[in-house]
Amino acid sequence: MAINNIIVVGCNIVGLYSALRCADNGYRVSIVDKLSSDKISRKNRNNYRVFNKSHHIYIHLLNRFSIKYEKYLLKYNEKTLNVLASIINKSKLIPKKSLNTQSFVKFCRSILSIADYNILKNNLEAYEHIYSNLSAMDALAMLSSDISATQEYYILTDDIGVLIDRMTVYLKTKNVEFYYNTEIRDITQSNNITYSSTRTNTFISNILILAISKDNLLKFNLLTKDQRKLLNNVSKYNIDCESIYTDKHLKNEYDIKTHLLDKLHIVCPIKKHSLYLWNYGINNIIIRDKIKHMFSHIFICGDAYSRSNFFINYSFETFDNIYSKIIHRMAHPY
């Protein structure tokens, strides 16, 4: 029976970041993952390569571990930009509740001429495939900030695996313990102590951080019906993000510097075949806050529940938003 202050479930980059923040504060931390070390190291090696100047958490992490990146130039289609600018301006006159209860596709059909709508449809890749599942409010927030033509973009020249490896080495110097091939099958909580059980062992901790997917979260019997309802406010879409949502030339590792996009792509180089999106018709700000306070000593920070699943910066932000609560719980465990 292993006893630790904090257990992190999930040895992905979000789990590593969570462990990093906790270890830097002097807490005793262990990371548990059901995969082997080799499988984890082979996973997501080409992910999260493009980011913009507003992604401060990610940039700070890259700088801390001396990860190399450079400016990345994007060339946007002027007609598309003009249509998007028109949509954004018109949306300012629409109540937020209305924007939140309809898909972006439906909203655009209601305010655009047929000609302008076709420009958008033809220049946003897989437009109706994804934007019919994204609320107008969420889409407008992303289009006016994260993938805006006015943003300054960067691209990693180092493999993301370099960051993961350096974080792992650093965590080991902080005496963080790694338990691979270890699947948490059951979670119970009693007297503000959390028990995380595997097939052969039980981890006891003051704090449990779950940096795992929605599918894996819902396997735990700990969750009540209402809690499951909260977690089901995101839906999984089987989308080949690598082929639809990325700059396809990013696959050519050494042909990046000279490439200019001639369409407005969602700049999201993630090698996933599925993506979680917030359901429209709900206020995900309120839902995220409820998930944050779902338990007293268990915290959920998987990227499915971040503000936006398209960029890793927001997954880190999800953890940062619960970090002060973790510190408080560690100082006042009972």
Regions found by a protein language model. Give the residues of each.
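Beta1/beta-strand and adjacent pyrophosphate-binding region of the FAD-binding site
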Residues: A2-V14
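Conserved flavin/dinucleotide-binding core of flavoenzymes
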Residues: N25, N238-E242, T246-Y334
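Glycine-rich FAD pyrophosphate-binding loop
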Residues: A23-K43
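Conserved Rossmann-like nucleotide-cofactor binding loop
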Residues: V14, S37, D215
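Active-site/ligand-binding neighborhood in enzyme catalytic cores
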Residues: K92-T182, T188
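Central helical "cap/lid" subdomain
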Residues: T182-Y254
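A short, Lys/Arg-enriched amphipathic alpha-helix followed by its capping loop at the start of a domain
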Residues: Y17-Y27, R64, K174
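Dinucleotide-binding Rossmann-like beta1-alpha1 core, especially the glycine-rich loop
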Residues: N44-S98
